[in-house]
A protein has these predicted regions:
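Ribosome-associated RNA-binding proteins
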Residues: 1-122
Length: 122
């Protein structure tokens, strides 16, 4: 069985190259550090803000948002090594100045970090 060949033995050829909207984007993960973001051109010429680094999170406490400084990444369910690298991903547990919190959004897609408080500092 030769992959990519016809029964006659000839090669299959692509009809066309990939279009811009079909190409995958570069994989990015926000990491802990001084706030740094980037704007990308997306479909129909709009701009999308992606987060590259951040040390601030919007934390929801009893229905009200409050900014807090991120101190450390405790755990990430995607990969335990991401926590060691201080990568900020959805549903990662982070240590903030207000206490432990869980990230509820996708920071690299939205350009900010939203989280809910799980455990308060005493």
């Amino acid at each position: 069985m030769n992959r990519g060949r016809k029964i006659s033995g000839g090669k299959y050829h692509k009809q066309r190259k990939r279009k811009l909207f079909e190409r995958p984007s570069q994989e990015r993960h926000a990491i802990l550090g001084e706030v740094k973001s980037k704007k990308l051109r997306v479909r129909s010429g709009k701009l999308k803000t992606i987060l590259l680094k951040s040390d601030i999170a919007n934390i929801i406490i009893k229905g009200k948002a409050q900014k807090a400084k991120i101190l450390n990444v405790i755990e990430t369910p995607q990969n335990r090594f991401y926590a060691r690298q201080n990568r900020l991903l959805k549903s990662a547990l982070i240590q903030t100045s207000l206490g432990k919190a869980k990230i509820t959004n996708r920071p690299t897609q939205e350009g900010q970090i939203n989280a809910i408080l799980i455990e308060e500092n005493k």
